[in-house]
Every structure is written in structure tokens, then in C-alpha cells.
Amino acid sequence: MQKFMIISPHTHDECTLVVKQTLAIGYLTHFWWGCKSGDHTGYAMIEANNTDEALLSIPTMIRKKGKAIGLVQFDPEKVKHW
């Protein structure tokens, strides 16, 4: 499994429905939301087998606007030998 940063932008008008759909698909507790600060975007860190699987955490109505960015964590010892 790989770690992904999920970025799920939506509009003010879509907000309530997006949050409810995120709850319905089981990912609400994975997300942190910028909506109350005027940034209508959900952010999450999840594990998935690939990008397509990671994108399933975003409701279908806005999935095309979302991103799943594969992440790595660098090992300090390996970095010393670069």
C-alpha cells in the first residue's frame, strides 16, 4: 500500500452535499476541511494500492476535480548518502 494526499475541491454550493456524500462512502473521518475558512477543499491522507483506488475516497460528483498525490517519506540515513 502507498500513502496518498487527497485534495478534494468543491464549491460553496456543493459543500453540504459533498460532506454528506463523503460520510455515506465511509471517508468523512479521514478528511480535514477548509470550508469554514473559505477554502472549500477536503484534505486527507489515506493508504491505497494505486491512484485510482485512492480517488475512490472522493464523492463521484466531484471526483474529476480531485487529486490523489502519491507520497514517500525519505529515510534520513539514505538521504545522507545521496
Named regions from a protein language model:
Residues 1-82:
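Conserved, structured core segments of small domains
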